[in-house]
Amino acid sequence: QHSKHHAAYVAGVNSAVAKLEEAREKGDHAAIFLNEKNLAFHLGGHVNHSIWWKNLSPNGGDKPTGDLAAAIDDQFGSFDKFQAQFTAAANGLQGSGWAVLGYDSLGQKLLTFQLYDQQANVPLGIIPLLQVDMWEHA
């Protein structure tokens, strides 16, 4: 089931790239914009799910240790406070999207934020570390 879901995003990327190429050759600007939007959606779905699959573990997880644990304590005050903020980000999404813990490479700190839909709307300089799929199918 999951591999079919993810494969649909990859197929969507390939289709959008082919249609985008054709639209550019024809100079069809409306089709260019439509296929750029479709490409962003499907590429976002592929990237988001690629991160998501790596976040999952058959044995569940536990609190982080090492540098990540220290950064969470420093940025959020404690793991429990981080967990509360991350849960609020996930539950506060209106519609479909993702809750994300990311490392801000410019500010050099951890942030939680929401992604709406799939369009890979990760702020510049952010490296996603943890994502939770909050789409209705999840």
From Swiss-Prot:
<feature type="binding site">
    <location>
        <position position="49"/>
    </location>
    <ligand>
        <name>Mn(2+)</name>
    </ligand>
</feature>
<keyword id="KW-0464">Manganese</keyword>
<feature type="binding site">
    <location>
        <position position="1"/>
    </location>
    <ligand>
        <name>Mn(2+)</name>
    </ligand>
</feature>
<comment type="function">
    <text>Destroys superoxide anion radicals which are normally produced within the cells and which are toxic to biological systems.</text>
</comment>
<dbReference type="InterPro" id="IPR001189">
    <property type="entry name" value="Mn/Fe_SOD"/>
</dbReference>
<dbReference type="GO" id="GO:0004784">
    <property type="term" value="F:superoxide dismutase activity"/>
</dbReference>
<dbReference type="InterPro" id="IPR036324">
    <property type="entry name" value="Mn/Fe_SOD_N_sf"/>
</dbReference>
<dbReference type="GO" id="GO:0046872">
    <property type="term" value="F:metal ion binding"/>
</dbReference>
<dbReference type="InterPro" id="IPR019831">
    <property type="entry name" value="Mn/Fe_SOD_N"/>
</dbReference>
<dbReference type="InterPro" id="IPR050265">
    <property type="entry name" value="Fe/Mn_Superoxide_Dismutase"/>
</dbReference>
<feature type="binding site">
    <location>
        <position position="137"/>
    </location>
    <ligand>
        <name>Mn(2+)</name>
    </ligand>
</feature>
<feature type="binding site">
    <location>
        <position position="133"/>
    </location>
    <ligand>
        <name>Mn(2+)</name>
    </ligand>
</feature>
<dbReference type="Pfam" id="PF02777">
    <property type="entry name" value="Sod_Fe_C"/>
</dbReference>
<comment type="similarity">
    <text>Belongs to the iron/manganese superoxide dismutase family.</text>
</comment>
<dbReference type="InterPro" id="IPR019832">
    <property type="entry name" value="Mn/Fe_SOD_C"/>
</dbReference>
<dbReference type="Pfam" id="PF00081">
    <property type="entry name" value="Sod_Fe_N"/>
</dbReference>
<keyword id="KW-0479">Metal-binding</keyword>
<keyword id="KW-0560">Oxidoreductase</keyword>
<protein>
    <recommendedName>
        <fullName>Superoxide dismutase [Mn]</fullName>
        <ecNumber>1.15.1.1</ecNumber>
    </recommendedName>
</protein>
<dbReference type="InterPro" id="IPR036314">
    <property type="entry name" value="SOD_C_sf"/>
</dbReference>
